[in-house]
Amino acid sequence: HVVPFTEIQLEINEKCPHDCITIIMRRFMMRIAEQLAKNNNCTALITGENMGQVASQTMQSLYVTNASVSMPVFRPLIGMDKTEIIEIARKIGTFETSILPYEDCCTVFVAKHPKTKPVLQKIIEYEKKLDEDAMIKKAVETTELIIAGK
């Protein structure tokens, strides 16, 4: 699934504290993923997160991210180091794609000093400035499905 996320990023960037935009974007990504999973009769989410690689992957950040969804979230790479992950990527043929240059939400909307220990209640308060339901609905409705190998 390719989810159009730019409008959500712009609104979060405009209405929320800059040091919290990364975690709020992650929470929106999880909510969108959860809705897409439900639409496809899936009962869990799987991510490629690894503990401590970036600010959004601290224990406290993962807790705040998880709190945005009700589905179980599996993170099979959580305890691996970067070398192990690269080795797996090479084995399954995704490494070359993973190193291609591109701009994503983490590079375009990066906070200079992102929160590494976000407080859930504060994040929820910031999110009240956003029309969460409408934003997620639009993103899900305009998602493009790409079948690998076709």
Language model feature labels by segment:
Residues 1-2, 74-80, 112-118:
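Short, exposed beta-strand "edge-strand" segments with a Pro/Gly-rich flavor and a Y/T-containing core
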